[in-house]
């Protein structure tokens, strides 16, 4: 990644500054005295980035800090789709943009699939995959699992987003050790047909459910209907009403083993997956902004945010470690925002921040 003898470290510094400050390459190049022009940076990226190669390099970078000895045995893994709203046309191929439910005034998105592991209070992103229009969920899952296989991660439990609640995806999960996927209420509200009838239950129980698809046929699987009461919140004036959660539970493990799992443990196992939602909020704090149509630059923006999130997880774990082995104790004052500020100050020290504006004509001292 070098053009016009431009050092790689200079390109990285500008990208990091744009990411940690939630700004664009254009803004950082105009704000830093030692930065080249934004067109130069974009030219280097345009000539250096290729989508498939970039995806592999990103995943290798995500793995770089992992110690294989700490990730032996079966892992609990969360899989999700990240939709970045897009208001524009595709750069080269129409399949770069994937359609979905309306969000932020558009139905067009750049979509990324991620695999995320939670172990001993460490939440780490292991792989990223660029999802194209028309790519099936099974193909997405195959791609993510191939990255995990290459890393040597063995998955004992898949925790998937409700977007994966389809016949094809559940059939894929049924060939894995075990998977928990929340179901979506479908059917008539009046007659409580379809899966909507499960959500109307006032008690917890196991049941069988058959899902139909015009393209993928029918699939019968176990469902856990969990009727639970929420714990009272300090801020809430009164106790929240009870809710009914419905999970599809599939996999190669025996049905008896699955039913032995208590409803509380099932909800707790899936609740840990919600760490991925807070991680995405933090990712948005560290994602550089761009109006470029380039899918490579869009992927790079998400990748930098994921790498920074992983770096913070590693640093925070180190600050929480005590003198004795085991899980860390207490809380840490080392916040994600703190890491972003440090990186911003580091780049400003290297490249010098513009602190004055040159005026072409004398300016009045009063309005």
Where is each model-derived feature located?
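Long, charge-rich low-complexity segments
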Residues: 48, 53-64, 345-367
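Short, conserved catalytic/metal-binding motifs centered on acidic residues
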Residues: 14, 28-29, 37, 41, ...
